């Protein structure tokens, strides 16, 4: 560590005070730097997220983030990373220095796990979804919304426990001007249609994002890809997701189809109903329909199962090492990226105005989609005793190779197939996963009729600030 780094750490330590002793930087996000630290009072390791000055100087952001951080201290769930403390301290320059103290989790993010494995067996993926849904149910009961559910914000511990992190940061981010240097673009791949259009975000928005995560875990690809964040957001608003592989059970495909409905009023309304639905599917049953009498009970915390133990063995808790500080010029690079994205938006608006391709949020008549069967050929015998991770497919941030295309469809339920018979009770065994997965993308034209200016509003709804995946 250079003398300059040591001096900077010492200055930061003075602001944080004697209750926490900084060790080293373990991560950087668009809004903050994360330090590993010792909680001297409680004798435990913690993660301290230090907000960047450009955000803590924004009063509207500060008010929102303060409210969310203080509310998060009251969240008590094994499946949500705990928030221990939040403080604001004036620095010598007269600015407000903000930091939040959180539970330090020795685990691997779901994003890293999927990057390595490609996809997960159905039973493991459903286990992840049920645990995450239960964590969301606690958040939603407090009338709060996470707003940024994605694999990068889901940690898996060595004993298979799933924990949601980065709670409450996206809401505060909406207060920051879009052109501020150092911003990063929100995660378009997991954004709900209403969030992409700048409409009201509710608990059902988190359910949509969790549905996208579930789709990706089992299909080995995201439902929507594109050349840019804008094109992905438009796909979330207008296109029906491609059908999931038929190797996935009908009841699980139906579950994901309900979660990915465009109309938030027709999805599971909150984490509690989602947890109940996933629990039913794990027992081999069809998911109950949202807002029915079967969904009135409170979901019980999922008990550790064989798949939970297997999940812990698959996850690889990261070795905690010191991370280099970002280069001073990194903010300029991000600023250029924002400028490029805005240029894409302007071009999209011009194109929309000349071709009639606009937004439409009204339900369209359902047509019968062409059924495309995806064949999976295992290279090893299926086993119920141990899962051997496959060779992961190549993953891409936005685009993926198209091997099969679906005809245009206006049905938002194309991922949901009605099973003709009741599925047998699950034995909760871990299936063997194929080592090679055909990957497909839907090619669906956008046909809409809302005002052209809505394109900018829709994209503005996307540009939330979030942590790095």
Swiss-Prot record:
Residues 365-384, 399-413 have a biased composition (Low complexity). Gene3D superfamilies: Phosphorylase Kinase, domain 1, Transferase(Phosphotransferase) domain 1. ATP binds at residues 26-34, 49. Residues 20-281 form the Protein kinase domain. Its EC number is 2.7.11.1. The active site is at 148 (proton acceptor). Pfam families: Pkinase. InterPro entries: Kinase-like_dom_sf, Prot_kinase_dom, Protein_kinase_ATP_BS, Ser/Thr_kinase_AS. Residues 286-307, 359-454 are annotated as: Disordered. It catalyses: L-seryl-[protein] + ATP = O-phospho-L-seryl-[protein] + ADP + H(+); L-threonyl-[protein] + ATP = O-phospho-L-threonyl-[protein] + ADP + H(+). One of its GO terms (molecular function) is transferase activity, transferring phosphorus-containing groups. Residues 430-443 have a biased composition (Polar residues). Keywords: ATP-binding, Kinase, Nucleotide-binding, Serine/threonine-protein kinase, Transferase. It comes from the Bacteria. It is an enzyme of class 2 (transferase). Belongs to the protein kinase superfamily. Ser/Thr protein kinase family. This is Serine/threonine-protein kinases PknA. The gene is pknA.
